[in-house]
Regions:
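Bacterial Sec-dependent N-terminal signal peptides
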Residues: 14-43
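Substrate-binding cleft/loops of secretory-pathway carbohydrate-active enzymes
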Residues: 149-152, 156-157, 233, 303, ...
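Substrate-binding cleft of secreted/luminal carbohydrate-active enzymes
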Residues: 342-459
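Glycine-rich, aromatic-flanked loop segments that form ligand/cofactor-binding clefts
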Residues: 79-90, 125-187, 224-227, 305-310
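Aromatic-lined carbohydrate-binding/catalytic grooves of carbohydrate-active enzymes
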Residues: 79-121
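Active-site-adjacent "subsite" loops/lids of carbohydrate-active enzymes
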Residues: 40-61, 142-217, 267-278
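Catalytic domains of carbohydrate-active enzymes, especially glycoside hydrolases
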Residues: 65-92, 217-220, 346-359, 424-428
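Aromatic- and acidic-residue-enriched segments that line the glycan-binding/catalytic groove
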Residues: 94-107, 148-189, 227-269, 322-333
């Protein structure tokens, strides 16, 4: 018994003499258990659908019920956001404004010709979409055609918009360097939108005022500038005296003869050689748009710090210089790829001033896959390269107007389109809602979106 007691005492003594490291296999034995680090949760990318004002006006211009019903269906299909056009190409508006006229009518294609559709309702069009979109679980963004002020309509419908109703606004309009000479766009008899001059200080102030009015809608989720560019005549615009003075100040010398020192009459795109003055001219145009976008973004955030601000652009960057827009990141070295670009042109990339951007990947129905422009996949991949992570972007096709789409019957392509575009961008963008409805693409788009969401949930 005494021997057993001695052994026990020796064992206790040995334990008492151990170091503080009681459990050498676990140094932190005496510390509280730490919870496992949470694994990052996969977040689904946003899915946007555009709602063009003119194309959808018969449904929504005078019917709050249809707005409510279709917002629900859009959400049920799997879209997360709607982009509502509230300033179509006439330049009149579908929101509360003290600086732009309210839209009273719009020309609509009615089977065999264009006809006027009158707005008889008095509800706030934008506010209706905000309320009904949010009720359906959608985020709501307002888009406006920025550099437009009127429209010359076909089929004898005549003229519409503030540049036609207010004669003082003619000086706001672009002057084109046409084959017959310098012509104000209001004096041209070709059908289409009439563009405002981005270099005109009064035009810039007008645009900023419109942005401020949109931002004043406190529940609005975002503002998207569409057609924030020079007009559809390519490099023929703008050669007004206002622009001449601004350009000469920009480059620091007089330009004579005007405008042939830059381009001969009727020039719409560049040739194989580009002069130093032409590079300065192209840089001046993109810098003009850059500065306007920067000011508009600042105004939107000043009025409403929570609102997002962005633009829609065509993804065809290689020829978008004709529109006077450099939507890329200023870190994208465009001057090594394009002979028309300079270091100053590169610096005028405006992507870093945006909260988001929408790229029209408007390839034809037979060109979903590829690595180049004019394929949807190529547009997305090149867009990512050019934006260089400066801003998140959504991309997608025009499913009603691009080659192969106008005939409809492309529902079988929608799942692949969704997979391709959302897989190579930060979000999906579909133009336009009217085409989804016209060709009944609801279920095929839902199939594609559901398949995408399944991959997110399995991560």
């Amino acid at each position: 018994m005494r021997k057993l007691t001695t052994i026990l005492l020796l064992a206790l003594a040995a334990l008492s003499c151990q170091t503080e490291k009681q459990n050498p296999w676990n140094e932190d034995w005496d510390k509280p258990d730490q919870p496992d680090k949470p694994q990052p949760v996969a977040t689904a990318k946003p899915r946007y659908v555009w709602i063009d004002a003119a194309a959808n006006f018969d449904d929504y211009g005078n019917s709050r019920d249809r707005i409510r019903e279709d917002c629900k269906r859009i959400a049920q299909t799997g879209f997360t956001d709607i982009i509502v056009d509230v300033r179509p190409t006439t330049g009149d508006v579908l929101f509360t404004s003290s600086v732009a006229p309210a839209l009273k009518r719009i020309d609509r294609w009615k089977g065999s010709s264009y006809e006027w559709t009158e707005r008889t309702a008095d509800f706030d069009y934008l506010q209706a979409f905000i309320e009904d979109g949010h009720a359906a679980g959608l985020k709501v963004h307002a888009a406006m055609n920025t550099m437009v002020g009127g429209y010359l309509c076909p089929y004898g419908l005549g003229k519409e918009g503030m540049v036609y109703s207010d004669s003082s606004k003619k000086e706001w309009c672009t002057v084109q360097n046409r084959p017959e000479g310098l012509v104000n766009c209001l004096d041209i008899d070709e059908y289409g939108a009439r563009f405002l001059n981005p270099a005109h200080k009064d035009v810039q102030a007008f645009v900023i005022s419109l942005v401020a009015e949109l931002a004043a809608y406190k529940e609005l989720d975002g503002i998207v500038l569409d057609r924030c560019r020079y007009d559809d005549s390519g490099l023929m615009s703008d050669f007004s005296e206002t622009t001449r003075k601004a350009f000469e100040q920009f480059c620091g010398h007089s330009v004579s003869p005007w405008p042939s020192a830059i381009f001969s009459p009727g020039t719409e795109s560049l040739g194989s050689a580009v002069s130093s003055l032409q590079r300065e001219w192209l840089t001046f145009r993109v810098k003009t748009i850059h500065d306007l976008v920067e000011k508009a973004a600042a105004k939107a955030h000043e009025v409403n710090p929570k609102i997002r601000f962005g633009t829609y652009v065509g993804a065809w960057y290689s020829s978008y210089y004709t529109s006077g827009v450099n939507w890329a990141s200023p870190s994208y070295n465009c001057k090594t790829e394009y002979l028309w670009a300079s270091a100053d042109y590169q610096a005028a990339g405006y992507a870093d001033h945006l909260d988001y951007i929408f790229l029209g990947a408007y390839a034809g129905a037979d060109y979903i896959h590829g690595t180049t422009e004019w394929t949807m996949e190529g547009f997305c991949k090149l867009g990512a390269k050019r934006l260089a992570s400066a801003v998140p972007f959504a991309a997608g096709p025009d499913i009603g107007n691009s080659s192969g789409f106008p005939e409809g019957g492309k529902g079988s392509l929608m799942p692949d389109i969704v997979k391709t575009c959302i897989g190579n961008a930060d979000g999906l963008f579909i133009f336009d809602l009217c085409h989804i409805k016209m060709y009944d693409y609801w279920s095929s788009l839902k199939t594609g979106i559901d398949a995408y969401l399944k991959t997110v949930n399995n991560q």
